[in-house]
């Protein structure tokens, strides 16, 4: 049976009217009733579990009690140190097998693990490398010696350089460090948000020359869909800037060409894997751009959605909120679709900040004013009661990416993540992984673990997991009839999962 779409506003029995105030012992019956009523409000609190699901839920509860009483509790530790502990967890292993629905917040440059980029892509012919003045790297595929440019004066053929160095394993490991944030000493290497964001953005730039090479991009997208499916994910909405794709001879393709390639790869992957439901693109631009540039990007997104209505889901603005321009700064550009009488759905990053009361902190309200379809991260939403109320009434889901929020130093102990408030109130939520390759993850299982065990705590149950997974289809950009089809497909996978785990 497919879960029905939750109502925008849920009316609860006002039990407080019936609670007697007493100086003596409170009524145990009233206490039990209040506890049950509060539990019914949480994410998954309205989900009725079958007997088989109840059995699995009891097993999960016992496992969670054991993990919460252990000497080291993974959600309280930086993910880079907690990862080995998580991978030993029986809960995590079960979550890997669980059908998780859709990944709705992943950036295209971080879809595939860096080991594949280094061990596969950089070993391909005609791959050049340059070491920059700011201790980063650039890559370029070319059929001739690349010309020097302002940030790269000397390009070296990687094949030749590896031979000279004589330690390919050590060299490859050093290359991986340029493409990921993962480190054994995260607190030492990243003492504050500025430092970690600087490395974060450098890694994006470093990977670009590899990923945007046309033959690599085709393989990369197929590989990325495969990694998601391996983690029991059936649908993807990928944020992409549609960077210019290039050929070995320097030919550069436009965005239409890149979208068509994405379409071809997705079609082939679905043909090879019929139980994968599909993928769409959310076109994204960096908030460091000027108003005129964003205007042009919005117009381009409108045209691309017109040409590819089944593939282009909408538009977003990316980049660090704290140092970037606000949504309100771009109000003229973001109002263009309405002025032109067209619909361009927005999927705004908003509230990825702990700077309460600043102009950046108002992005949450502005995202809702611009009628965003979902809120990316929404870390600060719990501090905005009106925005929280509006998003709930409008069924605007928050894309919760717990590992990203921890690694980028918004929160250290995930038990203190403000999404705990949202989960306790049953706020519309989906779980996603933001930039998996940057954090040393793949798919959604790691983030589901952190949300289920850390943020949700002991009260989060199988009903919570079931609702979060189903939410990812409900709150996708798919049209209503495809949501119904997707939910039916997901429900069959869920039922098989329950049957396989009695």
Which residues does each predicted region cover?
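Sec-dependent signal peptide recognition
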Residues: 4-12
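Metal-cofactor-binding active-site regions of metalloenzymes
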Residues: 2-5, 17-502
């Amino acid at each position: 049976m497919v879960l029905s779409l939750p109502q925008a506003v849920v009316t609860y029995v006002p039990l407080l009217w019936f609670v007697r105030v007493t100086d003596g012992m409170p009524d145990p019956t009233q206490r039990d009733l209040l506890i049950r009523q509060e539990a019914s409000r949480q994410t998954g609190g309205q989900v009725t579990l079958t007997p088989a699901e109840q059995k699995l839920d009891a097993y999960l509860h016992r496992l969670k009690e054991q993990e919460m009483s252990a000497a080291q509790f993974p959600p309280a530790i930086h993910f880079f140190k907690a990862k080995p502990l998580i991978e030993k967890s029986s809960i995590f292993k079960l979550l890997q097998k669980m059908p998780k629905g859709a990944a709705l917040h992943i950036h295209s440059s971080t879809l595939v693990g860096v080991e594949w980029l280094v061990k596969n892509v950089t070993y391909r012919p005609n791959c050049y490398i340059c070491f920059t003045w700011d201790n980063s790297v650039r890559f370029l595929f070319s059929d001739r010696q690349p010309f020097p440019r302002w940030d790269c004066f000397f390009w070296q053929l990687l094949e030749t350089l590896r031979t000279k160095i004589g330690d390919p394993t050590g060299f490859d490991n050093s290359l991986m460090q340029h493409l990921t944030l993962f480190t054994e000493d995260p607190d030492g290497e990243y003492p504050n948000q500025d430092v970690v964001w600087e490395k974060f953005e450098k890694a994006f730039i470093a990977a670009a020359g590899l990923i945007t090479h046309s033959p690599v991009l085709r393989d990369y997208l197929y590989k990325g869909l495969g990694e998601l499916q391996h983690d029991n994910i059936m649908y993807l909405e990928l944020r992409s800037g549609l960077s210019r794709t290039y050929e070995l001879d320097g030919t550069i393709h436009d965005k239409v060409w890149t979208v068509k390639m994405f379409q071809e790869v997705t079609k082939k992957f679905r043909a090879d894997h019929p139980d994968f439901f599909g993928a769409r693109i959310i076109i994204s631009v960096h908030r460091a751009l000027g108003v005129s540039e964003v205007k042009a990007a919005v117009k381009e997104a409108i045209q691309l959605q017109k040409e590819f209505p089944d593939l282009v889901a909408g538009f977003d603005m990316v980049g660090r909120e704290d140092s970037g321009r606000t949504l309100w700064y771009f109000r003229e550009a973001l109002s263009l679709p309405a002025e032109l009488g067209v619909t361009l759905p927005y999927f705004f990053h908003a509230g990825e900040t702990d700077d309460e009361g600043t102009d950046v902190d108002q992005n949450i309200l502005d995202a809702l004013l611009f009628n965003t379809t979902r809120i990316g991260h929404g870390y600060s939403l719990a501090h905005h009661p009106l925005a929280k109320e509006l998003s709930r009434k409008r069924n605007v889901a928050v894309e919760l990416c717990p590992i990203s929020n921890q690694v980028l130093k918004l929160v250290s102990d995930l038990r203190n993540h403000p999404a705990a408030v949202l989960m306790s109130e049953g706020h519309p939520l989906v779980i996603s992984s933001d930039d998996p390759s940057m954090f040393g993850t793949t798919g959604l299982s790691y983030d589901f673990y952190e949300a289920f065990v850390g943020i949700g705590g002991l009260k989060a149950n199988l009903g919570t997991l079931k609702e979060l997974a189903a939410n990812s289809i409900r709150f996708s950009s798919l049209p209503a009839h495809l949501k119904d089809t997707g939910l039916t497909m997901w429900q069959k996978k869920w039922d098989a999962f329950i049957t396989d785990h009695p």
